[in-house]
Regions:
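A structural preference for short, pocket-lining loop segments at secondary-structure junctions
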Residues: 66-77, 92-117
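Glycine-/proline-rich flexible loop or hinge segments
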Residues: 43-45, 74-82
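Glycine-rich anion/phosphate-binding loops
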Residues: 45, 52-58, 83-98
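A generic structural signal for short coil/turn motifs at secondary-structure boundaries
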Residues: 81-85, 117-120
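Conserved mixed alpha/beta catalytic, RNA-binding, or beta-rich assembly cores of soluble enzyme
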Residues: 78, 85-94, 110, 124-127, ...
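Conserved catalytic cores of soluble enzyme domains
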Residues: 114-205
Length: 205
C-alpha cells in the first residue's frame, strides 16, 4: 500500500519474490516462452511487453527458501500485458505446480492479472482448466497451497488458481473479482457499485 495515496502498489514479480524469499535463494524454473503461431500484431505486442516489463512472460515460477525451507513460487508480472494468461503462461504455471507436487514442495502464488489473454481467445480461457487440475492434484497430495491476491486480480485468474488456496490473503485495497468494473460498465452502461470488489469488502462478506 502506498503510504501517500492510500492505493495499492504494483510490485514487480521480482520485487515480490525478493521481499518474500531468503536473500539470494530464488532459482527460476522458467524456460523461454514460445511465440510460434502468433500473428504479426500479437508478436509485436509480446515484444513490447517484454521490453516494458523485463520479463519474457506474465508469470515467473521457481523455488527458493523461506527461513531455510524450500518452497515453490508462482508470481504474476502485471507489467506484461496486465498479467494476462495465455497458453505459454498457463503451461508455465501448470508445469510449476506439477513440479512442486512431484518434489513435495509447498506452493506460494501471487497473482495480479486482468484474466485470460484476449489475443488468444477461447484456448487461453480453457487453459485455466489445466491449471486448476494441477492445483487440485497438489492439494490432494496433502501439500499447502497459499495465495496472496494482489491488485488487481480478476477474470479467469480469480475464478481459477486465485481462488483455490488453503489460506488466501490479499493486498489491502486490492481490486478482486471476476468481472472488472470497466467491463461491467461497457456491458451494462452503468458504473459498478463502489467498494464492492475490494479485498476488505470480500473479507467482511
Amino acid at each position: 500500500m502506498n503510504a501517500e495515496s492510500g492505493k495499492p502498489t504494483h510490485l514487480t514479480a521480482r520485487e515480490l519474490i525478493d521481499a518474500v524469499l531468503d536473500a539470494g535463494s530464488f532459482t527460476s524454473w522458467d524456460v523461454p516462452a514460445p511465440t510460434a503461431g502468433a500473428s504479426a500484431t500479437y508478436e509485436e505486442e509480446l515484444r513490447l511487453a517484454r521490453e516494458k516489463s523485463g520479463a519474457d512472460e506474465s508469470v515467473l515460477t521457481g523455488e527458493g527458501l523461506i527461513h531455510g525451507r524450500r518452497v515453490a513460487v508462482i508470481v504474476s508480472e502485471f507489467r506484461f500485458l496486465a498479467g494476462s494468461i495465455g497458453s505459454a503462461a498457463a503451461h508455465r504455471i501448470t508445469s510449476a505446480v506439477q513440479r512442486a507436487t512431484t518434489e513435495r514442495l509447498p506452493l506460494l502464488a501471487g497473482p495480479a492479472s486482468g484474466g485470460t489473454r484476449m489475443q488468444e481467445g477461447t484456448p487461453a480461457f480453457l487453459s485455466m482448466v489445466d491449471i486448476t487440475g494441477a492445483v487440485r492434484a497438489h492439494r490432494q497430495a496433502g501439500l499447502p497451497y497459499l495465495v496472496y491476491l494482489r491488485h488487481p486480480t480478476t477474470g479467469g485468474v480469480m475464478a481459477s488458481w486465485g481462488s483455490l488456496g488453503h489460506v488466501t490473503v490479499a493486498e489491502p485495497g486490492a481490486l478482486l473479482g471476476f468481472l472488472g468494473p470497466r467491463v461491467y460498465e461497457a456491458l451494462y452502461n452503468e458504473p459498478f457499485p463502489s467498494g464492492v470488489q475490494t479485498a476488505e469488502n470480500l473479507f467482511d462478506h
